[in-house]
Design a protein with these regions (language model features):
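Nucleic-acid nuclease catalytic cores
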Residues: 28-58
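Short, surface-exposed beta-strand-loop junctions and turns on beta-sheet-rich folds
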Residues: 9-12, 56-58
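Conserved catalytic cores of phosphodiester-cleaving nucleases, focusing on short active-site segments
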Residues: 1-11
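Charged, low-complexity, helix/coiled-coil-prone segments
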Residues: 5-6, 38-40, 101-105
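Short, compact, well-ordered microdomains
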Residues: 20-23, 31
Length: 105
């Protein structure tokens, strides 16, 4: 099973306030039940979509809870999870979902 939410960002800094605590809690429980949870983030100014694995979201979330940044920067993201542009497909996340599955093994 797959659980995701779509978000939009107009700068290179994504505020974690755009994600609600209940969403993080739900995704955490979903992953514990062997589901795949992630965010799809549209960085509109770059015309790019990014697949943010729950494990990365959780890392940024916990950093904020521990008193650190309440956001993350584009530069902190793994470029391997930028969605490739494909003709005729607006949000081609399936290839990156396959990479996520492979990286978990």
């Amino acid at each position: 099973p797959v659980c995701f939410d779509a978000k939009e960002c107009h700068t290179d800094t994504f505020p974690l306030a755009n994600v609600h605590p209940h969403q993080v809690a739900f995704m955490e429980q979903f992953e514990k039940q062997e589901g795949i949870a992630f965010l799809l983030i549209s960085f509109t100014h770059r015309e790019e979509f990014y697949y943010l694995r729950f494990s990365d979201l959780e890392k940024f979330w916990n950093r904020a809870l521990d008193g650190g940044r309440k956001s993350f920067r584009y530069e902190e993201l793994n470029p391997e999870y930028i969605l490739p542009k494909k003709h005729g497909i607006l949000v081609p996340y399936l290839d990156v979902l396959q990479k996520d599955l492979a990286d978990r093994e």
